[in-house]
From Swiss-Prot:
Protein's name in the database: Ribosome-binding factor A
Stated family: Belongs to the RbfA family.
Biological process per Gene Ontology, one example term: maturation of SSU-rRNA
Signal sequence bounds: none
Lineage: Bacteria, Pseudomonadati, Gemmatimonadota, Gemmatimonadia, Gemmatimonadales
Length: 146
């Protein structure tokens, strides 16, 4: 199993710190959408960190939040330098992660297809099912006249 690479450990620590910062300390009024930190990737030299975020809200809120996140990146970088005790805190780059929205859309489409199929299938009467089962059992029974 080998040890975990240092950039991976730093990325996980950054993910936790950014999530805490956004839920408790982000004072930018442009950050109006619900923000979830989905992942963080850090370069080997620890100079750059790409923070992937999922944004929930309408398009205007998402656009505003994206601008707000870019604005707080430098403040967040200084906070990370203090809390993670790194010689040089990585430069923060925010990227929108569309995978959560895409997965939600796919789930919605699958549910719609399932509902349409259920609506198209004729509802079978349970009494008909039992009479059909009885006739099948009678035809499968061996002849006793032999």
């Amino acid at each position: 199993m080998g040890e975990v690479r240092r950039p991976d450990r730093v990325a996980e620590a950054i993910r936790e710190e950014v999530a805490t910062f956004l839920s408790e300390g982000a004072k930018d009024p442009r950050i109006r959408a619900f923000v979830t930190v989905t992942a963080v990737e850090v370069t080997r030299d620890l100079r750059h960190a790409t923070v992937f975020v999922s944004l929930m809200g309408d398009d205007a809120d998402k656009k505003s939040t994206t601008a707000g996140l870019a604005s707080v990146a430098s403040h967040l970088r200084s906070q990370l330098g203090k809390s993670l005790r790194l010689r040089s805190a990585p430069e923060i780059h925010f990227r929108t992660d569309e995978s959560v929205a895409r997965a939600s859309r796919i789930e919605h489409l699958l549910a719609k297809i399932r509902d349409e199929r259920e609506a198209q299938e004729p509802a079978q009467d349970p009494a008909q099912d039992s009479s059909q089962d009885a006739s099948v059992e009678a035809s499968d029974a061996p002849d006793k006249a032999e």
